[in-house]
Amino acid sequence: MLDLGCHPGAWLQVACQSLGPRSKGGLVLGIDIQETSKPGRYTDDRVKILHGDAREVDGTVWKSYAARGLDVVLSDMCHWTHGNSVIDSAKSLDLARTAFEISLYEEEGYRLLKPGGSLVMKILQGAGIEEFARELKTYYKTVKHHRPKATRSESKEVFLIGLNKL
C-alpha cells in the first residue's frame, strides 16, 4: 500500500494492521512533505516512510520499494485550507488528480498499482469532482463516493474510491 500524505500516521497504522501477521509480509509505504515519524503503536518494520513531495518522486523510487507493484494507493493529502470553499475544493481536486496520476504510473511493464487494485482519495466537495469521477471510470471497474459516518456535518470531506483497476 502507498499512503500519499501520510502525516501524522493514522492510516499507516490501519494499513499495517490490515496486512495481518508479519509472517504474511507486505509493505506500507508512506510519503509526506512534512517530516513524519513511524507511529510506534500498531506498526512494524513493514512500514517505510519517505520525506518529500510525492509529485517529485522518480519512478525508480516506486520500483525500488514496491518491485511487484501495490494493491492500494491511498491519498490523504490535504493542502492548507483558506476558508474559501471554491479555492479549497480546487486545490483538493488538484491533489486527488496527482494521486490518480501516481496510481497510473507505468514503465517497461511495471505498474505501480496492480490491475485489480484500488485507489482511495480524500477530497473536498466542489466543482469538477463529478467530471473527475467519470474520468476514473475509464480506469476502474467501480467508482464511488464515501462519506464516513464520523465526518462532521459541516465538513466538505468525502472519499472518492476507484475499485478494481482495469
Language-model features: locations:
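Conserved beta-strand signature within the Rossmann-like core of class I S-adenosyl-L-methionine
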Residues: R111-I123
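Glycine-rich S-adenosyl-L-methionine
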Residues: I87-E108
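A generic alpha-to-beta junction signature in SAM-dependent methyltransferases
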Residues: L19-S23, A66, E106-L113
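Conserved class I S-adenosyl-L-methionine
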Residues: M1-H7
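S-adenosyl-L-methionine
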Residues: I31-T81
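Class I S-adenosyl-L-methionine
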Residues: I123-L166
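Short beta-strand element of Class I
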Residues: S23-L29
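Conserved SAM-binding loop of SAM-dependent methyltransferases across substrates and taxa
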Residues: P8-S23
